[in-house]
């Protein structure tokens, strides 16, 4: 529990728009696996445990990989970080994405704002880049947006305002609270 609500605007939007929750099959890592499951609809529990990362071990070796991007006239991927991790540049090609925007790609990340001392581009930056795509689309378009703002590792010096939100409740030690 936090002393202040860090996302009041999001909560307000949820009251006025269609929203919901998704139960993540992973926490604290495995981003590419969550992407794979979201884009294909295939849960990793249906695969052998010897296949820990489908992006690098399955998708890059198959000619056909069914996924949601194939259902749209245009598909764009945006990841405001490096594109090579988990073989995303190859995976998105095989999935049929028309363009992949990442740092260093021929399709440029236009907005590049960071928050405080974070080494990663902000969610605001990611959303602005995605909104540019929405504005340019003439027909239906699928956008796969993978953000980086809250990616580990980070410590208490990650943000300048780390004292704005204080964890409260039982079981929180002084190290965590401070």
Predicted regions and their residues:
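Solvent-exposed soluble domains appended to multi-pass membrane proteins
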Residues: 2-178
């Amino acid at each position: 529990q936090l002393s202040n609500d860090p996302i009041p605007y999001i909560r307000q939007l949820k009251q006025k728009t269609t929203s919901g929750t998704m139960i993540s099959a992973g926490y604290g890592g495995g981003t590419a696996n969550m992407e794979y499951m979201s884009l294909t609809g295939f849960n990793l529990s249906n695969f052998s445990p010897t296949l820990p990362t489908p992006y690098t071990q399955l998708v890059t070796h198959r000619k056909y990989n069914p996924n949601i991007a194939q259902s749209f006239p245009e598909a764009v991927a945006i990841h405001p970080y490096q594109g090579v991790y988990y073989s995303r540049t190859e995976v998105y090609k095989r999935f049929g994405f028309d363009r992949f925007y990442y740092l260093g790609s021929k399709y440029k990340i236009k907005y590049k704002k960071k928050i405080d001392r974070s080494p990663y581009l902000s969610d605001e930056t990611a959303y602005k880049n995605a909104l540019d795509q929405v504005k340019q689309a003439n027909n239906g378009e699928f956008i796969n947006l993978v953000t980086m703002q809250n990616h580990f590792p980070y410590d208490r010096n990650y943000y300048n305002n780390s004292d704005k939100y204080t964890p409260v409740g039982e079981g929180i030690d002084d190290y965590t609270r401070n």
